[in-house]
A protein has these predicted regions:
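Extended beta-strand/beta-hairpin segments
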Residues: 1-64, 72-152
Length: 152
């Protein structure tokens, strides 16, 4: 029987500058993402939508979520296969298209992991393990756009 997991967070708008949402330019997009027992994450919208560039926006969090999920599966699979990873860094790129009505959607996210191995010969298994990590990634299995893995 499948296991069900539940995730709870709190998103609190902190951008009321005194007049609420009385006008498009009259409020900040600042918010705080939190959950019990963890540091809060400062959030905002993308700067293109009047957001604070110093805060995380939902689009960045989605891209990071896909990258992190893939990495964690990849590390697990490498460990199980006896492939010793010594470093891992990904610089993923998400592409979002804005529609004429102001909405939009992601069209693709490209993961670009750069992985170091204890023994360079172990890198040969990396492509197979990246493919399997992608197949198992909970987040990649939950989105309706392509997620590519292009190892560096």
């Amino acid at each position: 029987m499948p296991k069900t997991h539940s995730y709870e967070t709190t998103v609190t708008w902190t951008g009321n500058t005194g007049s609420g949402t009385s006008g498009y330019r009259d409020y900040e997009r600042a918010n705080e993402i939190s959950t019990a027992g963890k540091p809060a994450i400062p959030g905002s919208s993308d700067p293109a939508f009047r957001g604070d560039p110093a805060r995380w926006n939902p689009e960045e969090l989605l891209v990071a979520s896909l990258s992190q999920c893939h990495m964690l599966w990849f590390l697990h699979l490498c460990s199980a296969a006896g492939v010793v990873v010594t470093s891992y860094r990904d610089q993923p790129i998400g592409t979002m298209t804005e529609t004429e009505d102001g909405g939009g959607h992601f069209t693709e996210i490209a993961l670009r992991p750069e992985v170091g191995f204890a023994e360079p010969a172990q890198a040969a298994r990396a492509a197979e393990l990246h493919k399997r990590a992608h197949e198992l990634c909970f987040i990649a299995n939950s989105v309706n756009f392509p997620v590519r893995c292009d190892p560096v």
